[in-house]
């Protein structure tokens, strides 16, 4: 079983860490595809990649919500000027 860190920001990826997480996911995929890992290590690496993907997805969803709010604010400002 894979142990996960319990921290307040475990569900999010800091702005500077998004690219690092994506790079790590790509590295994990390369290690798995190389065929050189033992089966247990493959499962551990896969679990890590899934967790990183979940964190990246949460980060992107949060940023999408921020963008939607900004666009809505701009639209409201445009409509109030009419």
Curated annotation (Swiss-Prot):
- Cross-referenced Pfam families: Exonuc_VII_S
- Summarize the subunit comment: Heterooligomer composed of large and small subunits.
Q: Tell me its family.
A: Belongs to the XseB family.
| Matches recorded under InterPro entries | Exonuc_VII_S, Exonuc_VII_ssu_sf
Primary location: cytoplasm
Task: Write down the EC number.
Answer: 3.1.11.6
Q: Which organism is it from?
A: Nostoc sp. (strain PCC 7120 / SAG 25.82 / UTEX 2576)
GO CC annotations, alphabetized = cytosol; exodeoxyribonuclease VII complex
Give the EC class as a word.
Answer: hydrolase
Per UniProt, subcellular location reads as: Cytoplasm
What is this protein's function?
A: Bidirectionally degrades single-stranded DNA into large acid-insoluble oligonucleotides, which are then degraded further into small acid-soluble oligonucleotides.
- The protein here is known as Exodeoxyribonuclease 7 small subunit
The protein's UniProt keywords, in alphabetical order, are: Cytoplasm, Exonuclease, Hydrolase, Nuclease
Reaction(s) the record says it catalyses: Exonucleolytic cleavage in either 5'- to 3'- or 3'- to 5'-direction to yield nucleoside 5'-phosphates
């Amino acid at each position: 079983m894979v142990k996960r860190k319990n921290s307040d920001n475990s569900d999010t990826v800091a702005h500077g860490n998004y690219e690092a997480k994506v790079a790590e996911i790509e590295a994990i995929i390369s290690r798995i595809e190389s065929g050189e890992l033992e089966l247990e290590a493959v499962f551990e690496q896969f679990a890590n990649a899934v967790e990183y993907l979940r964190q990246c997805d949460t980060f992107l969803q949060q940023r999408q919500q921020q963008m939607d709010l900004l666009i809505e604010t701009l639209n409201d400002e445009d409509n109030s000027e009419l």
